Structures are given as structure tokens and as C-alpha cells.
From Swiss-Prot:
It catalyses: 3'-dephospho-CoA + ATP = ADP + CoA + H(+). The lineage of its organism: Bacteria, Pseudomonadati, Chlorobiota, Chlorobiia, Chlorobiales. This is Dephospho-CoA kinase. InterPro entries: Depp_CoAkinase, P-loop_NTPase. NCBIfam families: dephospho-CoA kinase. It comes from Chlorobium luteolum (strain DSM 273 / BCRC 81028 / 2530) (Pelodictyon luteolum). It is an enzyme of class 2 (transferase).
């Protein structure tokens, strides 16, 4: 059967795992990259339905205007609330992620038209939304918990306690690993991760050439 889209790859992992760095390497090697979290952030200040939903969850004053007139969203406030109330986090994800996935499917069509062979979606949550089953291949980036906490703190994502709370709300890493088609262990430095990315890229090229009928644990 002739494919109607590029080979679709998901890259996921918990906070501080290094999935973004891995994806940057894959992009430089020739993959096209779709950043789900970046698209979600854009939709939060541009999509009327999502904006109304966010106002319902967090109050109208969660949005404000900057001096230049640009719409601003109080993301720190949202983060405090969702990571203290798991039900609110679930409601926010249900509001945003279907539209993020629609944007990904549209990108896949456009990428196919450009002749893109491999389209990578970087996403903080993938199995959790049920979208992993729609992909041809899923990569999980894993790392030791303390290493992940240090990385997240260094990036300014919160205090160690904040990061621990966020990790506690995410799927356990072992659950992600058990469902992956490929696991990158990232308790290593950037140079080693680049080498791992090179090996992964070779696997993806071979899998893309063989088609989507891989031995996936999700099927």
C-alpha cells in the first residue's frame, strides 16, 4: 500500500529526560520536527474555544494585555494550580490536546506533500492521550529521577520540590519504557546523547523504508 503520510515518530519522556535535546539532534540529521508543547502554548493565546475553556477553569483574569497590546497568559499561575489539582490538569489536557493532534495531522499532510520521509512529534504526554497508537514508532527518553530534577531546576522550571510534584503526576517512567518501540537512556552527557541520536536515526530510516508495519508494542 502506498503511504499517504511520512513515517510518524513520537518522542516522549518525563520532565528533564532530555527529549527536546534528542529531537534537536534528529532534526539536524534530517527529520522534520513538530513540537507539541510549543503548538499547545500558541493555541492557548490564539484559539477562541481553548481560551474560553481556560477562562472557565482558571478565571478570566488569567489573561492580560502587555504594554504593546499583546495577549499574555499567566502560565505560572496555571502551573501552580494544575500541579496541585490533578483533575484540573486532566481537564486542561482534554481541552488542548485534541487540537494539538489535529495540528499534527495537518502538518503530516503538508510534510508528505513536501516529500518529508520522517516526521517527529515531540510531546510531553503521548501514551496518556491515547495518540501513541496512531503513530508508526514511539521513542521514550529515560533518565534517573535525580538527574531529571537537576536538569529541570537548571532550566528554571521550579524548585526540586516543584519538580518532584510534577513527576508524581506523570506516568511512571517504567510504564513509558514498557510501551516504547525504542528507549534512549539519557543519564549521559550531550556528546553521548548525540551518538545515541545517530543510532536512533539509522533505526528510523530503516523502519521508514520498511513501512509502518513494525513490531510495535502498541499494536
Amino acid at each position: 500500500m502506498t503511504p499517504s503520510h511520512p513515517f510518524l515518530v513520537g518522542v516522549t519522556g518525563g520532565i528533564g529526560s532530555g527529549k527536546s535535546t534528542l529531537c534537536r539532534f534528529l532534526e539536524k540529521m534530517g527529520c522534520e520536527l513538530f513540537e507539541a508543547d510549543k503548538v499547545a502554548r500558541q493555541l492557548q493565546v490564539s484559539d477562541p474555544e481553548i481560551m474560553e475553556g481556560i477562562k472557565s477553569l482558571f478565571g478570566k483574569d488569567v489573561y492580560s494585555k502587555t504594554r504593546s497590546g499583546k495577549l499574555s497568559l499567566d502560565r505560572k499561575r496555571i502551573a501552580r494550580e494544575v500541579f496541585s489539582h490533578p483533575a484540573t490538569l486532566g481537564a486542561l489536557n482534554n481541552l488542548i490536546h485534541p487540537k494539538v493532534y489535529n495540528a499534527f495531522r495537518q502538518r503530516a499532510l503538508e510534510a508528505f506533500g513536501r516529500g518529508t520521509a520522517i516526521l517527529v512529534m515531540e510531546a510531553a504526554i503521548l501514551f496518556e492521550t491515547g495518540r501513541a497508537a496512531d503513530l508508526d514508532f514511539v521513542v521514550v527518553v529515560a533518565a534517573d529521577t535525580e538527574t531529571r530534577i537537576k536538569r529541570a531546576v537548571t532550566r528554571g522550571l521550579g524548585t526540586p520540590e516543584d519538580i518532584r510534584k510534577r513527576i508524581a503526576l506523570q506516568w511512571p517512567q517504567e510504564m513509558l519504557v514498557a510501551r516504547a518501540d525504542y528507549v534512549v537512556n539519557n543519564d549521559i552527557g550531550k556528546t553521548k546523547l548525540k551518538e545515541e541520536a545517530g543510532r536512533l536515526y539509522s533505526v528510523l530510516v530503516e523502519a521508514a523504508a520498511s513501512g509502518p508495519d513494525c513490531q510495535s508494542k502498541r499494536r
